[in-house]
Amino acid sequence: MFDIEAVRNRLRSLGYEPGENDEAALNFCVEKVRSTIRNKINGKNVPEGLEHIAIDMAAGEFLLSKKTFAPADLKGLDLDYAVKQIQTGDTNTVFATGEGSQTPEQRLTSFINYLLSYGKAEINSFRRIRW
């Protein structure tokens, strides 16, 4: 279910522990994403098939606001390791440690952009005609 607790759990899985001071911002982000999706699909609720996308979008909105207004709070996020290669079949995972020219802030920005944009094409499959 897409709610504030699901977004909290997603943030924990990313290495950020939401505190009591984050409650208002989390509520705002969840409602913003819920409203955005409902307006795009012309529906009353976020469909079950879009919940994982909504959770990531809300987490991305929250991390973006933290990065903008309280960047010191994001010290718990580990941005040193990024998966460089994943091979299906004989499992082969290679980490891109020290590779690339991106700073940790640029990697955070790229990750936030991914969270905000991932799955937007899937939203279209849930659209209804507006009369």
Language-model-detected regions and their locations in the chain:
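Mature extracytoplasmic domains of secretory-pathway proteins
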Residues: 47, 51-55, 60-69
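Conserved short "hinge" loops at termini or chain/domain junctions
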Residues: 1-53, 104-131
